[in-house]
Structures are given as C-alpha cells and as structure tokens.
C-alpha cells in the first residue's frame, strides 16, 4: 500500500511539472518557434528526409530530432503541448534510463527512485526538458549510450556483451542523426577514465567495432538519401555546424572556459548542497568495484569537453546531469542516514533562494526601486504570481531545513510554484518581443488574408509561419541564420532588402494585402522606420505590425 501511494505521488508530481504547464506557456522565439515550424512543414509536405524552415533548406541539424518533434505534433495536434511533447518524452525516457542505471550500479531501490526525481526537478533539466529544442533528444541518446556500455561491461556472457554494444551503436547512430558527430565524441570521453582505470581496453577493442558498424548502419540510409537529394548537406553540416561552431576563432556563441560553472551551480538547484559531496564521494570511491568512477567520468569528461570548445550554450551540459543525479541521490540518502549537515544546508539554500526571489520581485515591481520596472502597474497580478512561486520555494526549503533527516526530499517541490505559474507571470515587455504568438493572436484577422507576410526576425518568422500554417514568410532586411538557405537560386523570392522594399511593394501590393511584422531595436520608434506609410499599423512594445492594402 505504501509503495502504491509513493507511485501515485510520483506520477502526480510528474504531471504537475511536465504535462500540465506545457500548453499554457507561449512559445519562445527563436528556438521554439523555429523547431515548431520545421516539424509542421515536415508533416505538411511529407518530406522526412530534407529539413526545411520557411520552405528553405535548413541544414543546422540532422533529421532525427525533427522526427520526434513531428510525431508530437502529429499525435497531439497543432498546439503548444504538441510542440513541446518531443522534449518531454525524451527527458522522461532519460529519467527512466537514469533509474535503471542507478539500480544496476548500486542495487538500492531508494537510489533508483530518487535519482530520476533529482534529475527531473533539477532546474537546468526542467528548463530545457519542457522547452522545444533538440538537446533533450541528444541527452536521451547519450544516456542510452551510457547505460548500454555499462550493461555490456557488466555482462557475463558473450551475447550480453554483444547486445550492449549493439545498443551502444544504435544510441550513437541516433545521436548523430539528432545533433551530429558530438554523439560520437561524448561517449568516448565519458567512458575513458573508467576504461583506463579498469584496464578494459581489450574488451573495448574486441567489441567496439560492433558498435561502429551498427552506428554506421543506423545513419547510412538517411545519410545516403539526403546526400542524393542535397549533395551539399554533409559539407555544410560538418564544416559550418561542427568546425566553425566549436573550434574556430570565430566560433558561434564564444565564451570563456569557466562559462558552464555558473550554469552547473544554478542548474543543480534545488539540490545544490548535494553537488560538492556527490562529486567528492564519487572521487573517493573511484577504486571500488561499483560504478562511482564510471558516473563521475560521464559528468566530468563531457563537462571539460564542452568547456574546452570555443562555442558554448547552456543547453550543451544537459547530458552531464543524468549521471550527476545518481551520484547526488546516493550521497543524499547516505547523508540522511548519517545525519550529515549537507541536507540541512540544502534546505537553507532553498530558503535563501526563495527569499531572494521574493526580494527580487519586490525590487523589479512597479513599487520597487527600478527606474523602469519589469512589470507595469496593470500587471500587478503577475507580480503576485511570481511572489507566490518564490514563496513556495522558500516554504519547501524551510520545511526541509527544519527536519532535514526525514523531509530533505521536499526540495523536489521547491520549483513547483515556478513550474505552474511562470507562464502566467512573464512581463508584457518580454512577451511582446520574445513570444510572437501574443501579437499574432491580436492581429490575426488582418494577417490571415495577407497575400505576403514579411518580417525582419527569424524567430518571429517561425512563429508567424507556425501560427498561420504557411511557410512562405518572406525575410525583410535581415537574413540571420537563414542566409545559407536564402543564397540558393530557388529562394530569391524569399528575401526583400530594405532599400528595395518600396519598388517591391509597388510591384506586389496589387496581388493582395502585404503585412510586415518587425522587431525594432531598443529605443526605436515606428516613426523611425524608413518605410512607405502603411494603411494599417499596430505597435506592441518593440514589435510593430504594418499592412499595405491594394490600391
């Protein structure tokens, strides 16, 4: 009966975190609107080989992540839940793999249960796991690689080892098809410390070729198909999306070596106090037969790998949290048994985070000290919701601190207020520029019949295309990440320069209404735009809607 009650509680907690809020949060640009539209176009065209965005060639990533996202929209429809379902599905499967690996390594049911709980409630995991990007998918395949290699290494029969390496090849192959050759590098560096320490080179060399063959067989059908359809794909994807992004001096998203440390710290909330002890214990137990060193290798080596790379984004270290959550769960359970101070400190940290959040809400509110508050006076209910969210965090932290020996796991409830309320507390000024669904809904009656729709922002373009269910959105003045696709001869009609807009408008407005949705620079006004006078205009923060009717 007790186990049933715990099971129901965990399912309810998962639903509150990962299912209920999805449809009530507007899509963010540029990432969510981009991936929503790519998958919508895949379903609309039936082309499951070549990724397209706004009808243009879009070779930033391979195809498998788009497949998962497309299945989400196919199953649940054209809504925000369907867009985000792929990420939730991937992160949920990762959590189940975390539970499996925790059980296989430590043979402790409590560790196997708490590991996915810690994983799913860690802030970085939750933020990315409910956000429509491809990182949860690559995390799933890397977690499968981590589990399959361990299963193969611990198997006592030849067939068990073969099965493990076959699964490793499948995981690496799907990883390559999701986010590229990164899926080959991370497993290699992840297992390296354990293989060296345990002197398992002979076994790896004996069976490793099997994983390589299976990986190749997984990638080959689609790899050949897209090479036949789009011969330039592999050149662009390998050189631009791998070499230039990660290694060259002008790499995208350049950041210093220590860039990920703050994200590791903040992303570990509400379990931050467990982080030092978990890593330390993993190191101290490196010589034991259990897999502490194996888990530590999968945390530290990918973290160092991404830190060395010149191009960095917070989402890249998401795979590190799968093994880290197992180390943290084991350390927490041992701390509860021995009465260690770490659990009480964890409660104190969460109490402090909640109180600091409440103070921050007060400071940036209309009655705070900022010259330009985050929320305006008509958004007081949003201030209240934000305050409630942080109050929940503080309350759970306080309860966990008061009885850390028995209630330390209440830390899992700390982010629940944010999870349920953050979508309703986003300031209007942020919604206006970062969540284009809001504007599209306001001007939809004018947008729907438009013959041409133009925008100067790729993220807004994705939002317009997805909301209007049309891929013929035209880029105006700026090309951004669509430059490669726009450079092709068959895409010349998909871009209009600002200098040539007046002539283009004169030639096209008689075919039907022409609508522009433009993101202005900070401090810029609609009156500053060097454009012909529109017939209709609507300004919402930094976003302006202009419409030209036939004359």
Swiss-Prot record:
Single GO molecular function: 4-amino-4-deoxy-L-arabinose transferase activity
UniProt membrane topology term: Multi-pass membrane protein
Record field: catalytic activity: 4-amino-4-deoxy-alpha-L-arabinopyranosyl di-trans,octa-cis-undecaprenyl phosphate + lipid IVA = lipid IIA + di-trans,octa-cis-undecaprenyl phosphate
The protein's annotated pathway: Lipopolysaccharide metabolism; 4-amino-4-deoxy-beta-L-arabinose-lipid A biosynthesis
Top-level EC class: transferase
EC nos: 2.4.2.43
Tree of life domain: Bacteria
Subcellular location: Cell inner membrane
A Pfam family of this chain: PMT
Any one GO BP annotation for this protein: lipid A biosynthetic process
Residue intervals passing through the bilayer: 8-28, 85-105, 111-131, 176-196, 207-227, 255-275, 291-311, 313-333, 349-369, 380-400, 408-428
Gene Ontology CC terms: plasma membrane
Keywords: Cell inner membrane, Cell membrane, Glycosyltransferase, Lipid A biosynthesis, Lipid biosynthesis, Lipid metabolism, Lipopolysaccharide biosynthesis, Membrane, Transferase, Transmembrane, Transmembrane helix
Family designation: Belongs to the glycosyltransferase 83 family.
Protein purpose: Catalyzes the transfer of the L-Ara4N moiety of the glycolipid undecaprenyl phosphate-alpha-L-Ara4N to lipid A. The modified arabinose is attached to lipid A and is required for resistance to polymyxin and cationic antimicrobial peptides.
Name of this chain's protein: Undecaprenyl phosphate-alpha-4-amino-4-deoxy-L-arabinose arabinosyl transferase
């Amino acid at each position: 009966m007790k186990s049933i009650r715990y099971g129901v509680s965990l399912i309810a907690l998962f639903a509150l975190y990962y299912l209920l809020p999805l449809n009530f949060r507007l899509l963010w640009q540029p990432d969510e609107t981009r991936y929503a539209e790519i998958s919508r176009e895949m379903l609309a065209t039936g082309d499951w080989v070549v990724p397209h965005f706004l009808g243009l060639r879009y070779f930033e990533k391979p195809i498998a992540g788009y497949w998962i996202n497309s299945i989400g929209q196919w199953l649940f429809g054209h809504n925000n839940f369907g867009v985000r379902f792929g990420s939730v599905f991937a992160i949920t499967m990762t959590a189940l793999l975390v539970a499996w690996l925790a059980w296989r390594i430590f043979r402790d049911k409590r560790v196997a249960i708490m590991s996915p709980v810690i994983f799913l409630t860690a802030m970085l995991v939750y933020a990315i796991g409910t956000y429509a990007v491809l990182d949860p998918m690559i995390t799933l395949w890397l977690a499968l690689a981590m589990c399959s290699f361990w299963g193969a290494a611990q198997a006592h029969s030849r067939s068990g080892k073969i099965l493990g390496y076959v699964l490793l090849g499948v995981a690496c192959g799907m990883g390559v098809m999701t986010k590229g050759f990164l899926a080959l590098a991370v497993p290699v560096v992840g297992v390296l410390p354990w293989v060296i320490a345990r002197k398992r080179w002979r076994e790896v060399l004996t069976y490793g070729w099997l994983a390589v063959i299976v990986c190749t067989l997984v990638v080959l059908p689609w790899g050949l198909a897209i090479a036949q359809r789009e011969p330039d794909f592999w050149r662009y994807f390998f050189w631009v999306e791998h070499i230039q992004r990660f290694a060259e001096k002008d790499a995208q998203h350049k950041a210093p070596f220590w860039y990920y440390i703050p994200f590791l710290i903040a992303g570990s909330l509400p379990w931050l106090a467990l982080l030092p002890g978990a890593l330390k214990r993993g190191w101290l137990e490196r010589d034991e037969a259990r897999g502490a060193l194996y888990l530590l290798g999968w945390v530290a080596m990918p973290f160092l790998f991404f830190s060395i790379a010149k191009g960095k984004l917070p989402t890249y270290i998401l795979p590190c949290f799968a093994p880290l959550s197992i180390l943290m769960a084991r350390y927490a359970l041992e701390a509860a048994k021995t009465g260690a101070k770490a659990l009480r400190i964890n409660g104190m940290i969460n109490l402090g985070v909640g109180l600091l959040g409440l103070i921050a809400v007060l400071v940036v509110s209309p009655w705070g000290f900022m010259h330009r508050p985050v929320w305006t006076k008509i958004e007081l209910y949003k201030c209240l919701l934000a305050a409630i969210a942080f109050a929940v965090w503080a309350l759970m932290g306080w309860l966990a601190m008061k009885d850390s020996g028995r209630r330390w796991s209440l830390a899992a409830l700390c982010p629940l207020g944010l999870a349920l309320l953050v979508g309703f507390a986003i300031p209007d000024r942020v919604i206006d520029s970062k969540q284009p669904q809001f504007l599209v809904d306001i001007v939809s009656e004018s947008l729907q019949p438009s013959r041409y729709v133009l925008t100067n922002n790729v993220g807004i373009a994705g939002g317009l295309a997805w909301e209007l269910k049309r891929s013929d959105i035209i880029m105006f003045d700026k090309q951004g990440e669509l430059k490669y696709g726009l450079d092709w001869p068959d895409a010349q009609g998909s871009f209009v320069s600002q200098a040539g807009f007046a002539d283009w408008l004169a030639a096209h407005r008689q075919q039907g209404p022409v609508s522009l949705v433009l993101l202005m620079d900070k401090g810029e006004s609609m009156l500053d735009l060097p454009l012909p006078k529109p017939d209709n205009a609507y300004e919402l923060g930094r976003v302006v809607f202009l419409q030209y009717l036939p004359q």
